[in-house]
UniProtKB/Swiss-Prot annotation:
Coiled coil: none annotated. Disulfide bonds: none annotated. Signal peptide: none annotated. This is Glycogen synthase. It comes from Prosthecochloris aestuarii (strain DSM 271 / SK 413). The gene is glgA. ADP-alpha-D-glucose binds at R20. InterPro entries: Glyco_trans_1, GS/SS, Starch_synth_cat_dom. Belongs to the glycosyltransferase 1 family. Bacterial/plant glycogen synthase subfamily. It catalyses: [(1->4)-alpha-D-glucosyl](n) + ADP-alpha-D-glucose = [(1->4)-alpha-D-glucosyl](n+1) + ADP + H(+).
Length: 491
């Protein structure tokens, strides 16, 4: 297969900057562009949630993609498609919309997350069917449909059943990337029976009268990947972090492939970033201090020249470290640091963090929603970036931090270790690592980091060394391209 002829449709539940809840959105912001540079022709599909601003992102209607009929077992709904280009690229991004299913702001949720299960299940089925119906109306036939996590987990099963006799879909291959094994898309079987024919239902992964979308997906995609060798090992070996996924992985002849994340140097470049107060590079590191001063002033705090600023950008969901951060706040506040936290998700956790900020007004600031601009500004301003996730497939946060001269502090949690080099003792590297998931271990690691920070010359060597590291997608994109060729039979 010639690289230039590989056409790939990427399907995701979230993409930054349109909407961001997890690192998946960061992955999708850059990965399709990296694959285009590798020679693929990429297009993207995602839901048009109510929170996505049409004017801000220049979404526009496509007349020939209006009133697309999406037929489930008992009814027919109409699908409308809006389109824009993925920022910093010309990649066409299609937003699938139906007022009944996507007018509300929320992303997909399931029984694990205490969602409105009936409506959420209907949204999922509508979206999966809608992806295939939109492709037919569009008349653009991809060689590969590459889906992210469980949101489009029905696509390969639908291709093998309801759409098996459709000539348009002949020879299309499917790839799944698992970013988070905890999120599995679990719904009552009876809901699917109302919407899909028995030929689909009979091939779903069903346990205790519930359908597991992620397990179903792993059973039917042509290839399954995740975002690091370490996380692939964790999932395949049946550790607790696999959440049972090993039971379906072991049945696959081709197993699970780990390919690390990369960085888009055009999107994440402090020397050209329009979202930060002062652009900088290794020759202009003093401008990083100006960024720090600006961010602190935004939160009503004063710059303390000799005090490092710690940043943290977290989503308050399970295993992402929000509770560890909360438990560590008092201990962190005893150290000579200032801390700025951007947190989204759980309102109760946000309230608790805000109460802590009131108790430490000169040392702690909390921003209670996700903002792309604040995200970039924290990277540009902070000296250290706390990434408290307990389980991480690979993540992108440590890559952003390294590129912006903010030294990560991470737990030895899966794939993030593959993209950093530990600073230990007199040995320089790119990140500080705590090896026990506890407040005590985190605080001890911060004490080591502050000791290193106090050595100005060494700190500058670490920061400048980080900023010139090659973190790009180049090697990983080549591996994905090889995977695509293998899935298509090496044509």
């Amino acid at each position: 297969m010639s690289r230039s002829t590989c056409k790939v449709l990427y399907v995701s539940g979230e993409i930054s900057p349109f909407i961001r809840v997890s690192a998946l959105a960061d992955f999708m912001a850059s990965f399709p562009h990296a694959m285009e540079e590798e020679g693929c022709e990429a297009r993207i599909m995602m839901p048009k949630y109510g929170v996505i601003n049409d004017r801000k992102f220049r979404l526009h209607d496509v007349l020939r993609l209006s009133d697309i009929e999406v037929r489930s077992k008992e009814k027919t709904d109409l699908l409308h498609v809006k389109v824009t280009a993925l920022p910093s690229s010309k990649i066409q991004t299609y937003f699938l919309y139906n007022e009944k299913y996507f007018k509300r702001n929320a992303l997909f949720a399931d029984m694990q997350q205490g969602s409105d299960v009936k409506n959420s299940l209907e949204r999922v089925v509508f979206f999966n069917l809608g992806v295939l119906e939109t492709l037919q109306r569009l008349g653009w036939k991809p060689d590969i449909i590459h889906c992210q996590d469980w949101y489009a987990g029905l696509v390969p099963l639908l291709l093998k059943t309801m759409y098996a006799d459709c000539e348009f879909f002949k020879d299309i291959r499917t790839v799944l990337t698992v970013h988070n094994a905890y999120r599995q898309g679990i719904y009552p079987l009876k809901g699917f029976k109302k919407m899909l024919p028995s030929e689909v239902i009979d091939k779903m992964h069903v346990e205790d009268d519930t359908v597991n979308m992620l397990f179903t997906a792993v059973e039917h995609f042509d290839a399954v990947t995740t975002t690091s060798d370490a996380y692939a090992g964790m999932l395949a070996d049946g550790r607790s972090e696999a959440f049972g996924l090993d039971r379906v992985i072991e049945k696959r002849a081709s197993g699970l492939v780990g390919i690390a994340n990369g960085l888009d140097a055009k999107q994440w470049n402090p020397a050209a970033d329009k979202m930060i107060k002062k652009k900088f590079d290794i020759e202009r590191l003093s401008e990083k201090t100006e960024n720090k001063k600006y961010l602190l002033e935004e939160f009503g705090m004063e710059l303390e020249e000799a005090t490092p600023l710690v940043g943290s950008v977290i989503n308050a969901e399970r295993f992402q470290g929000s509770e560890l951060l909360m438990e560590s706040i008092d201990g962190l506040m005893e150290l000579d640091i200032q801390l700025v936290v951007s947190v989204s998700g759980d309102k109760e956790l946000i309230r608790r963090l805000q109460e802590k900020a009131k108790a430490y007004p000169e040392k702690l600031a909390v921003y209670s929603e996700f903002s792309d601009a604040i995200f970039h500004q924290i990277m540009a301003s902070s000296d250290l970036l706390l990434i408290p996730a307990e389980v991480e497939s690979c993540g992108m946060m440590q890559l952003f931090a390294i590129a912006y001269g903010s030294v990560p502090v991470v737990y030895t949690a899966g794939g993030n270790i593959e993209t950093i080099e530990e600073i230990a003792g007199d040995k320089n590297g790119s990140a500080f690592v705590f090896h026990e998931y506890s407040v005590e271990s985190l605080l001890a690691t911060f004490e080591d980091a502050l000791h290193t920070y106090a050595d100005g010359e060494r700190w500058e060597r670490i920061v400048t060394g980080n900023m010139v590291r090659d973190l790009t997608w180049k090697n990983s994109a080549a591996k994905y391209n090889e995977l695509y060729q293998g899935v298509r039979g090496g044509e």
